[in-house]
Design a protein with these regions (language model features):
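Short alpha-helical donor nucleotide-sugar binding micro-motif in glycosyltransferases
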Residues: 272-273, 280-285
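Short hydrophobic beta-strand element within catalytic cores of glycosyltransferases
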Residues: 310-313
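Nucleotide-activated donor-binding/catalytic signature segment of Leloir-type glycosyltransferases, i.e.
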Residues: 253-276
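Conserved acidic donor-binding segment of nucleotide-sugar-dependent glycosyltransferases
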Residues: 325-326, 330-336, 344-350
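N-terminal subdomain of nucleotide-sugar transferases
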Residues: 1-49, 53-57, 398-415
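Conserved donor-binding/catalytic core segment of Leloir-type glycosyltransferases
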Residues: 203-229, 242
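Aromatic "clamp/platform" in nucleotide-sugar-dependent glycosyltransferases that forms part
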Residues: 293
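Donor nucleotide-sugar binding/catalytic pocket of nucleotide-sugar-dependent glycosyltransferases
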Residues: 43, 59-62, 138-194, 204, ...
Length: 415
């Protein structure tokens, strides 16, 4: 008989930071806890003190913040890796795969419980940014990819947010089973705003607003977007680019550029803003955009879609599975194409409204409250059916086929 209330371990180096991975982990943990299951979060520097479900439990593992602008925390809980006192756990859900992931693997083996891994951000793309000297050396070859494969291969199955992300992992020889399901967005993003009034606060009255909600990091290419917007502004004189989001390695460069005379009248940076303001900006913006060639999913696009705002983004990993080209927005292969698509939508109010309605309808499938219910089914399946096969050393092909058959009956999950 299946256990009615599960004790689920969430393992991540990111939880309280302001970025897509941290949001995905935090919102899912809260949504599962709201269903009555115990979620135990093992993460460094967790910010406590806010109202949360009684079944959401925080376990501090220690860490040092080495990049205050991004909130990146280096955590190496060596003293905990081989000593697990949490024998109540039923399953481990691992969200980051370096040292904390290794700890979770060791604990799971010691406890004899299954483990699932969500693969959001490839370490290969971020190590050089957050660990500047050693990281640059490590990313010159495929050492980091091989390390991730070594860890991920130990999981009962791997979860990714989009099909294009699965294709990327398969290109780097990650093994099946790999299942695709959105990380989901918080139900609060669907709030029906009766009053907005946000344009006055951010000096956007009478403007056609392109919103770029993102951390200011090189992989998000904010500088490229600012420069191409200068050309776009010539075609639409009342167009305005508003950047919002947490600080990152590109923050100072962005601030310097937008102070220049040729940009300051039609580009602004608001920094990290309160959630109510972000929600109102998603609602009032004419368009949102995201220009990144490697995304787990592109949650900021989904958040805007929940408020009925269409998007233009890079035709790349993650984003290409979120924007439905010609229906909820456009996918661009280069910046010139990006510029043309933005101009087209800003000039055509009817088309933009149609795309916005489509976007809001599509976004309904991404509510994290519904995604959490699917996760409970996956956890129970893994505990009761999949893990026993791995424990008894059944061949991988048998396990892959079992996963493929099971997810046929689940909403929003594909193989």
């Amino acid at each position: 008989m299946a256990k009615q209330v599960l004790d689920i371990g969430f393992f991540s180096t990111m939880y309280s930071q302001i970025n897509g991975t941290a949001h995905a982990v935090r919102f899912l943990s809260e949504a599962i806890a709201n269903l009555g299951h115990n979620v135990h979060v093992f993460a460094p520097r967790v910010q406590n003190g806010y109202k949360r479900p009684k079944t959401l439990h925080f376990h501090e593992i220690g860490g040092v913040m080495i990049a205050p602008k991004t909130g990146f925390v280096l955590s190496a809980p060596i003293h905990k890796i081989f000593f697990c006192q949490h024998d109540y756990l039923d399953i481990s859900h691992i969200h980051t795969h370096a040292v904390v992931g290794s700890m979770a693997v060791n604990w799971s083996k010691y406890l004899g419980i299954p483990m699932i891994g969500t693969h959001n951000s490839p370490m290969q793309y971020y190590t050089a940014q957050y660990v500047p000297i050693i990281g640059k050396l490590m990313t010159k070859g495929d050492l980091i990819w091989r390390y991730e494969r070594h860890i991920v291969d130990k999981y009962d199955f791997v979860h990714v947010a989009t099909k294009s992300k699965k294709d990327l992992l398969r290109d780097y020889r990650f093994k099946e089973p790999i299942v695709c399901m959105t990380n989901g967005i918080h139900d609060l993003y669907f709030t029906n705003l009766k009053e907005n009034g946000i344009r006055e606060k951010y000096n956007l009255e009478g403007k056609k607003v392109l919103l770029y909600a993102s951390r200011l990091s090189p992989e998000k290419h904010p500088i490229d977007i600012i420069k191409i917007f200068k050309e776009l502004h010539k075609a639409i004189p009342n167009a305005h680019l508003l950047l919002v989001g947490s600080d990152g390695p590109s923050t100072e460069q962005v601030k310097r550029i937008i102070k220049k005379k040729q940009y300051r009248d039609f580009v602004s940076y608001a920094g990290r803003i309160p959630f109510p303001d972000l929600l109102k900006l998603y609602d009032t913006a004419d368009l949102t955009c995201l220009w990144s060639w490697i995304e787990a999913e592109g949650l900021v696009l989904l958040e805007a879609m929940a408020q009925g705002t269409p998007s233009v983004g890079a035709n790349a990993c993650g984003i290409s599975n979120i924007i439905r080209h010609g229906e909820t927005g456009y996918l661009a292969n280069n910046l010139d194409q990006f510029k043309d698509y933005v101009i087209k939508l800003l000039k055509d109010d009817d088309l933009r409204a149609e795309f916005g309605k489509n976007a809001q309808k599509v976004a309904q499938d991404y509510r994290v409250s519904e995604i959490a219910k699917t996760w409970i089914k996956l956890y129970n399946f893994t505990i009761n059916e999949l893990y026993p096969l791995r424990y008894n050393r059944k061949d991988r092909k048998t396990r892959v086929e079992l996963v493929k058959e099971f997810i046929l009956h689940l909403p929003n999950v594909t193989f």
